[in-house]
């Protein structure tokens, strides 16, 4: 057979540069390609010019909070503001509801729904006294709500080219067009580049793929964030003890969970208010409260996680779907627990909290399996009270006596997508290292190839045949490990929530024994010094 085609050196160099140094100017499409976007931008500008009364209805997660903060920043740079409304997860549930929208429409001229609203037909219809603009990314049906504009790359009549964007990125696209219209009117528009820190946070926290446009948004957003110019993000980094320039990892695992904590186990609007804060003292007070709630969330999550895993194991982990449901499980942590089950089994997972004959659940999927469309289908079939989402994450509400039937049907639909054909969760190893080779210089080279995240994973290393020197519990159930190569080189490893896991038990009970270890590398900052640590994912006896 003929040899495969090869890139010439110039083309290869261009590919290399686009991956390592993606530029927004090279990857940013014309926002007007999205349906209703130009109309939505014009309506926003008209509201600002006429000094209309504005309200923002935002989802209670990081993407919703970041989207709301983006809009508020843009408005405030023009001397305007808006009422912020974030629904209570338990009392109101996801998305716009009739009482809230009727109330907002009574004393506002324009309501902008961000990261929600695409399936809220009754609630949008109830807001007749105001115009409603929806900026969302969740899967839509053929029919759309009766809003002034619905900007959503996952509308059925869209091309799908931008379906990977989170809601905050879609809001950013709307504001790019709004700024274009402002410049066309010979006015100076707000600074959008300085808002990319919020877009980066939402993109990573919502597990959007870090490829193409998303990669450029996150790369630039991390640069903006390192300037510590946004009081809310600065305060969140400080309460988390983050004293280095942030990486994508910190957005997903350090800052993101704290922003989410208010919507999960506290007051729903705390995260959005912290991100939108302009006063450093207010931002710090909100960040402190979110940090406290995040600690509460961890304790609640641990209880639900243990019960859900026990139930799922009893039901079986070899099907197309792993699921669990329990009375009194906090609806604010079921999504995190579903993510833990998905990570542990390599299969789509759904976890449902039951109360008063009704279950509220959340699901997480694996690459190549569209969970959102499957849940939307069983909702249309009448097995759910409601349900929807996107490919990798979705939510649902179901009657308690319908759970078995709904999960059976969902498993069938996911099996048709190939979910049941996946084998045991294997780790892909990129290279083998010894402790002495895991240096700060190596980490600098790895980080230069970032940002890493969904669809752009950081390299995973195996440390073969190393000796376990010490294992102990740190924090709330984390495993801290020291290991060496027997030649004098040693390093530290950490497995979050790993102390009571089978891996944690094996390592803590076999001090002095030799194991193969695998995971990704990170930098540990302690006492003014830097060292490389292994974020441990798996271990096996080497003998």
Model feature map: region roles:
Residues 114-166:
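Histidine/acidic-residue-rich, glycine-tolerant segments that coordinate divalent metal ions
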Residues 50, 212, 282-324, 369, ...:
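Mid-to-C-terminal polyanion-binding domains and interfaces
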Residues 2-5, 137-138, 153, 330, ...:
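Histidine-centered active-site/metal-ligand motif
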Residues 70, 145-185, 192-204:
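Short alpha-helices
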Residues 13-109, 129, 180-402:
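Hydrophobic helix-and-loop "lid/oligomerization" segment in the mid-to-C-terminal part
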Residues 9, 112, 260, 446, ...:
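A residue-level signal for conserved active-site and pocket-lining positions in enzyme catalytic cores
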Residues 1-16:
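Short, small-residue-biased leader/transition segments that mark boundaries at the very start
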């Amino acid at each position: 057979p003929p040899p495969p085609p090869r890139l010439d050196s110039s083309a290869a160099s261009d590919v290399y540069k686009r991956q390592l140094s993606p530029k927004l100017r090279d990857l940013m499409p014309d926002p007007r390609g999205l349906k209703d976007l130009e109309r939505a931008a014009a309506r926003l500008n008209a509201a600002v010019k006429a000094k209309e009364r504005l309200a923002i209805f935002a989802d209670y997660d990081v993407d919703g909070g970041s989207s709301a903060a983006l809009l508020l920043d843009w408005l405030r740079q023009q001397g305007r503001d808006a009422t912020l409304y974030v629904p209570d997860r338990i009392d109101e549930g996801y998305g716009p509801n009739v009482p809230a929208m009727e109330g907002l429409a009574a004393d506002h001229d324009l309501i902008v729904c961000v990261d929600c609203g695409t399936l809220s037909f009754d609630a949008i219809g109830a807001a007749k006294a105001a115009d409603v603009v929806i900026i969302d990314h969740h899967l839509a049906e053929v029919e759309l709500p009766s809003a002034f504009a619905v900007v959503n790359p996952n509308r059925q009549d869209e091309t799908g080219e931008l379906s990977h964007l989170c809601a905050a990125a879609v809001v950013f696209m709307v504001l790019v067009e709004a700024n274009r219209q402002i410049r066309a009117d010979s006015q100076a528009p707000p600074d959008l580049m300085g808002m990319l820190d919020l877009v980066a946070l939402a993109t990573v926290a919502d597990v959007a793929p870090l490829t193409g446009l998303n990669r450029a948004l996150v790369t630039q957003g991390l640069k903006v964030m390192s300037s510590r110019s946004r009081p809310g993000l600065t305060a969140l980094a400080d309460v988390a003890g983050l004293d280095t320039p942030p990486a994508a990892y910190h957005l997903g695992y350090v800052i993101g969970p704290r922003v989410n904590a208010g919507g999960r186990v506290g007051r729903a609007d705390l995260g959005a208010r912290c991100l939108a804060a302009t006063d450093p003292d207010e931002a710090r007070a909100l960040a402190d409260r979110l940090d406290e709630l995040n600690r509460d969330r961890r304790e609640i999550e641990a209880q639900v996680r243990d019960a859900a895993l026990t139930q799922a194991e009893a039901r079986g982990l070899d099907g197309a779907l792993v699921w669990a449901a329990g009375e009194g499980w906090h609806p604010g942590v079921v999504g995190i627990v579903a993510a833990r089950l998905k990570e542990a089994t390599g299969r789509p997972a759904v976890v449902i909290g039951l109360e008063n004959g009704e279950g509220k659940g959340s699901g997480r999927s694996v690459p190549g399996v569209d969970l959102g469309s499957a849940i939307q289908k069983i909702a249309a079939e009448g097995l759910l009270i409601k349900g929807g989402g996107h490919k990798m994450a979705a939510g649902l509400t179901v009657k308690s006596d319908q759970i078995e039937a709904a999960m059976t049907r969902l498993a069938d639909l996911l099996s048709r997508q190939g979910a049941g054909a996946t084998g045991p969760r294997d780790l892909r190893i990129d290279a083998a290292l010894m402790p002495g080779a895991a240096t700060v210089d190596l980490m600098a080279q790895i980080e230069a190839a970032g940002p890493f995240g969904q669809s752009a994973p950081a390299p995973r290393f195996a440390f073969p045949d190393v000796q376990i020197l010490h294992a102990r519990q740190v924090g709330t159930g984390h495993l801290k490990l020291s290991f060496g190569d027997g030649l004098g080189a040693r390093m530290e490893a950490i497995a979050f929530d790993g102390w009571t896991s089978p891996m944690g038990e094996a390592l803590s009970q076999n001090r002095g024994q030799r194991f193969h270890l695998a995971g990704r590398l990170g930098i540990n900052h302690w006492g003014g010094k830097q060292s490389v640590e292994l974020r441990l994912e798996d271990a096996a006896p080497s003998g």
